[in-house]
Amino acid sequence: MFPIKYIDNNLVWNKDNEVFAYYELIPYNYSFLSAEQKFIVHDSFRQLIAQSREGKIHALQIATESSIRSMQEQSKKLVTGKLKEVACQKIDEQTEALVSMIGDNQVDYRFFLGFKLMVTEEQLNLKNIKKSAWLTFKEFLHEVNHTLMNDFVSMPNDEINRYMKMEKLLENKISRRFKVRRLEINDFGYLMEHLYGRDGIAYEDYEYQLPKKKLNKETLIKYYDLIRPTRCVIEESQRYLRLEHEDKESYVSYFTVNAIVGELDFPSSEIFYFQQQQFTFPVDTSMNVEIVENRKALTTVRNKKKELKDLDNHAYQAGSETSSNVVDALDSVDELETDLDQSKESMYKLSYVIRVSAPDLDELKRRCDEVKDFYDDLNVKLVRPAGDMLGLHSEFLPASKRYINDYVQYVKSDFLAGLGFGATQQLGETTGIYMGYSVDTGRNVYLQPSLASQGVKGTVTNALASAFVGSLGGGKSFCNNLLVYYSVLFGGQAVILDPKAERGNWRETLPEIAHEINIVNLTSDKDNAGLLDPFVIMKNVKDAESLAIDILTFLTGISSRDGEKFPVLRKAVRSVTQSDSRGLLHVIDELRREDTPISRNIADHIDSFTDYDFAHLLFSDGTVENAISLDNQLNIIQVADLVLPDKDTTFEEYTTIELLSVSMLIVISTFALDFIHSDRSIFKIVDLDEAWAFLNVAQGETLSNKLVRAGRAMQAGVYFVTQSSGDVAKESLKNNIGLKFAFRSTDINEIKQTLEFFGIDKDDENNQKRLRDLENGQCLLQDLYGRVGVVQIHPVFEELLHAFDTRPPVQRNEVE
């Protein structure tokens, strides 16, 4: 039953001397694709299958395992900076928590494709005939040796080289349409051990030794080494196999397709994609495809047509009515004949086998029922042929033959392409900051926020900026805090603008990094007067001048298009910039010195703000020193008593205190420019909570673009936390945002706007439903590669949950 005779690189010889070349199809992301994008993938796969006019194709979907510990260890290598020790300790604790929750390994579906290499006809001459006869004789001798001694298998080097040349051509053809990787000896070893019931080994950690002895004209391998991965006790029952190893046993059952009773309409027929999400247990699938070339297929179809016509005539002569089955079959056969005749396409004999394994018989029965129900819903009827378990088991082995002809389905390339082979949901990176897990597949999601600017192959953006959008209470602040916290642990530096003063207790709740947390709380205390004056806070005088003009025009409502007032104000600000003592109070003095009706008017207007509530923070007389330092790893700037306007309030309706509040946000955000221009080798984050407050005013919008552009050059990401995607969806900003997080929203217009912001079909009802039905802590994530999926944010640690929770205490007690 063991079909493999010899393995060399990715080539496998079977006992019938057929040679298959095996590749791993690198999975492609399939979630949230539009119908058009799905059809593009479908066409590529159809062409991949149709390019082989003859031969066989073996497709395998195998549930392999990947090690959580090795991913976490790789993540530790990314940590730098002052908090390296704390970060590594945190990652170790995280690893232990994850392992205790989901085990050492997580299921990772891999897709393998084997193509039979067809020998090109050699020229018929005496030399080739002699060579062929000699090879046949040698083959006979080796077979005798093998039968008597059962010790080694030999393969002529000429034969190996000949097939390797053919494989190179094949690989070249395949890789034009899909990303593939040639299989290696370790892959074959893992595949065989997996099929014979071994698990608990991570795919990347597995090693398989197959020593070769290269002689002058041939290469030898020990037969024992070849079959070593299959060692286990197999006990065959009617409908399952029992696989016993030294330390454990498992039960395996095989299904095959009996009939497809309805139409499998694309794009909703992607069985390979949906079964990854449907089952909580691993399921393997094998497709053994034999290509029936066009002429042969047409002959078969025409013969079948004659049979059906005979049945029809027989019924007519007997005076009875032809059954509806025969009439339907005649219609289908006519359609198929026309189709094959016009397209000149091949037909495919498909043997489709599903492998289900479990640790005990009861669990196996439950899993088998679940698999059967899933396929039933897709109009595919499965059977477990009694007594054929070992034969169906052998179909999964590389280079194996079709075991049974009773369950063959005749299909076209369209059908095979529509099964979604290689489709999966991928999100984020393979290592980095653990943010949570994919809701659909359960796979861990890792992010590396600083990666965008590195120009990694496959990324669709090089923007470091990120957006967190969603209605109140969905979890956007929590997710944002978690990402900033881990970015700081991994060696980054951050400034958080905290207008609602929600992060003031972080020194107490995050004791391990308390020494690196700097909280700047700007109260309306008289001692803080002038601390937010543009001339005090900005290092660069030119930046201070432009910020001063922005703030004063914002407060007074003077437009740069106002030919009377704006030049007067501009002149006064320039005079202060050029003087030795700089401060906004001097601008008022300068305007009074001008002593014209317009300048006095502007001076009085500005002066009316100076003693209003906490406005004195903005006005200094030039003697105030900058007391805000951003040298720590995590800096939080809070301004007490800020009153932010409602989301829907227009600029004209802003009250005086709202105007002042927004102008302070603009000053602090501009101050972040200095922070961005610090050490370029360190990844920096400027986190703007309640970003909508200044994104909705012209000065704030200009500033946000400036921050984002400066950030890209200086390795700094600007994080916008806002309630509506419309705030960050303006073309100038939208194209400069990399990572996107969208939390629950119930307003249909907002949902459509968010989907459009993510670049996915906004009118697709399924997409709208996904966003509407998100639970707290779940978000739609778009990564740097443009892939979209639903993620459950997972803080792992209780203390982080409490530290970043922004719900009021009363509500929290109710929840508990």
Where do the model's predicted regions map?
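Conserved P-loop NTPase motor cores
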Residues: 312-314, 450-474, 478-484, 497-504, ...
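P-loop NTPase motor core of the ASCE superfamily
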Residues: 100-101, 540-586, 729-816
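Switch/coupling segment of Walker-type NTPase motor domains
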Residues: 60-75, 81-82, 92, 102, ...
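Charge-patterned, long linear interaction tracts outside catalytic cores
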Residues: 125, 439-445, 450-452, 457-470, ...
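P-loop NTPase motor domains
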Residues: 35-53, 276-279, 292-299, 380-381, ...
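Short glycine-/polar-rich loops that comprise or flank the Walker A/P-loop
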Residues: 53-56, 109, 490-492, 517, ...
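Extended, folded cores of ATP/NTP-driven motor/assembly subunits in large transport
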Residues: 1-410, 420-421
